[in-house]
């Protein structure tokens, strides 16, 4: 049986992306869908998360799913249990899908053909973040009604960003032109879906300014020299925002380091779609859960802790 995993954006065709975005738009416009029978899903987060974890949980509960919230610190993972055995255990007791965030790049490669329930990737190391990409696509589509011909700048810590990787690939597939702007030390030469240009050249040209969080936790050491000058050299300052072209928007996957990637007063400015992205995250995650569980139509309401 083919599993409806969601692991990377590269595995989704343009048609599949369009179908997910259409379902997400329907949910955004008030469509309701509930499971007809009790259906358990488990959220396995091995890295800290606020937006993605709670967004998935809200999406699950809106769909009437029973949510199993997994704590790695309080589980048999601490006793040496493998991720495969953890998923097989959840599968054996009746769980129908798992949402996983893990610090290991492509943790799912050794699992996807071995388990019998869908895996929804909520972020793998520096690798992929498909639901973040999909909510970004939804936000852009709501704004411009298209992807073809748009110019999009992805700015910041490109090397360590799974958001940059997923978005650059998907947006290129959909017809947008991608540019990167980054400190030299944080360029990702393996990401071939965009062209590097100086930030100040991109500011007046692009339709979307997509800022990336500086990922302190993924650096081998804290690049203090870069950080001292980051906002002035590589961040979206008030002065740069004034030079952005009419109708262009600001995006950021969050959490935001205010006055680092973006001036604090711009986080909720007229151009900003940062909190709109968060809102859209719920609708997109409802859509990918619907794809993973085609029988989603009604169900139970309470939460279980494991």
Swiss-Prot record:
Quote the protein name from its UniProt record. Aspartate carbamoyltransferase catalytic subunit
Q: Which InterPro entries match?
A: Asp/Orn_carbamoyltranf_P-bd, Asp/Orn_carbamoylTrfase, Asp/Orn_carbamoylTrfase_sf, Asp_carbamoyltransf, Asp_carbamoyltransf_Asp/Orn-bd
Q: Which NCBIfam families match?
A: asp_carb_tr, PRK00856.1
Describe the subunit structure.
Answer: Heterododecamer (2C3:3R2) of six catalytic PyrB chains organized as two trimers (C3), and six regulatory PyrI chains organized as three dimers (R2).
Q: Where does carbamoyl phosphate bind?
A: 51-52, 101, 129, 132, 254-255
Cellular component aspect of the GO annotation: cytosol
* Keyword flag Metal-binding: no
Q: Which family does it belong to?
A: Belongs to the aspartate/ornithine carbamoyltransferase superfamily. ATCase family.
Q: Which PANTHER family match?
A: ASPARTATE CARBAMOYLTRANSFERASE, ORNITHINE CARBAMOYLTRANSFERASE, MITOCHONDRIAL
Question: Which GO-annotated molecular functions does the record name?
Answer: amino acid binding; aspartate carbamoyltransferase activity
Q: Which organism is it from?
A: Bacillus thuringiensis (strain Al Hakam)
Q: Which gene encodes it?
A: pyrB
Q: What is its EC number?
A: 2.1.3.2
- What exactly does this protein do? Catalyzes the condensation of carbamoyl phosphate and aspartate to form carbamoyl aspartate and inorganic phosphate, the committed step in the de novo pyrimidine nucleotide biosynthesis pathway.
Record: residues binding L-aspartate: 79, 162, 213
């Amino acid at each position: 049986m083919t599993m409806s995993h969601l692991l990377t954006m590269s595995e989704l065709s343009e048609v599949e992306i369009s179908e997910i975005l259409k379902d997400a738009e329907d949910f955004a416009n008030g469509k309701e869908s509930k499971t007809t029978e009790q259906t358990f899903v488990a959220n396995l987060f091995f890295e800290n998360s606020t937006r993605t974890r709670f967004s998935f949980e809200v999406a699950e509960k809106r769909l009437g799913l029973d949510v199993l919230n997994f704590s790695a610190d309080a589980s048999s993972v601490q006793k040496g249990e493998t991720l495969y055995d953890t998923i097989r255990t959840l599968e054996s007791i009746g769980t129908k899908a798992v949402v996983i965030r893990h610090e290991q790049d492509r943790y799912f490669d050794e699992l996807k053909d071995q388990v019998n329930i869908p895996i929804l990737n909520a972020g793998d190391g520096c690798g992929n973040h498909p639901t973040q990409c999909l909510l970004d696509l939804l936000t852009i589509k709501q704004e411009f009604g298209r992807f073809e011909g748009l110019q999009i700048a992805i700015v910041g810590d490109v090397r360590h960003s799974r958001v940059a990787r997923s978005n650059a690939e998907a947006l290129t597939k959909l017809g947008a032109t991608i540019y990167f702007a980054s400190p030299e030390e944080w360029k990702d030469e393996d990401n071939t879906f965009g062209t590097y240009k100086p930030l100040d050249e991109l500011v007046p040209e692009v339709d979307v300014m997509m800022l990336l969080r500086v990922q302190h936790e993924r650096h081998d050491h804290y690049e203090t020299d870069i950080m001292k000058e980051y906002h002035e050299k590589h961040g979206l300052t008030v002065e740069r925002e004034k030079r952005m072209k009419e109708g262009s928007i600001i995006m950021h996957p969050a959490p935001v380091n205010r006055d680092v990637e973006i001036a604090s007063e711009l986080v909720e400015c007229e151009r900003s779609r940062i909190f709109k992205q968060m809102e859209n995250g719920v609708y997109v995650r409802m859509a990918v859960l619907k794809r993973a569980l085609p029988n989603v139509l009604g169900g139970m309401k309470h939460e279980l802790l494991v």
